[in-house]
Amino acid sequence: RCYRPAITFKPVFEFSPDRVLAWLLHGFGDGLDLKLRKAAPCEGPGNLVRPDLSILATVTRAMCAKSALKVTYLSLSSGAASRELVPVALADNGLRWHVRAFDRNKSRFGDFVLSRITKATELPGSVEEYELLGADEQWARIVDLELVPHPGVAWPKAVEADYGMTDGALRIKSRAALAGYVLRRWNIDSSPDHSLDPNFHHLWLRN
């Protein structure tokens, strides 16, 4: 049995976008934001980007149903434009969320900032296999990243302690489609000759 919201549907509970996205990323609990009192003072910088939950709901429903969407998307280069997307995954780059989707306008997979989708409508009809996640080679390909303290850092042991390095290196795996986000999020110098300022780039991509 499958339940789909009608046009008149209104949620009983109100949830913050941060909470909903955390559930999608880490798994669902009991479905309630209990707002438990903190055991110790603990604060973070917060998130300035808050996607529209109705858009997120439409996107995730299309992902589960393997259907296409007609969206209005705001691009920095071309402004508002209509696109046909087949959403296949969500990706968090540390600052904002992206929708990984097959772009029918350009016949390729790409990332679309979730908060820049201002309108989304599910399209009738089936999608092709080449539009689904299994056909996304960049998503399927796993790359190895070997991170070391930037050679320009005066005290590399401090960086090793920050990241819990073993033998002076941190080895991680990433989807090829997301590797750029990893490099940007952690300000990793990926230049061959580690030429970026070590005061802002504590890590260097050795491989």
Task: Identify the residue ranges that each predicted region occupies.
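Conserved glycine-centered beta->alpha loop in an early N-terminal alpha/beta scaffold
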Residues: 1
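Bulky hydrophobic/aromatic content
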Residues: 5-74, 180-185, 189-206
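Core beta-strand-centered patch of the WYL/Sm-like small regulatory domain
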Residues: 37-163
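Polybasic (Lys/Arg-rich)
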Residues: 138-207
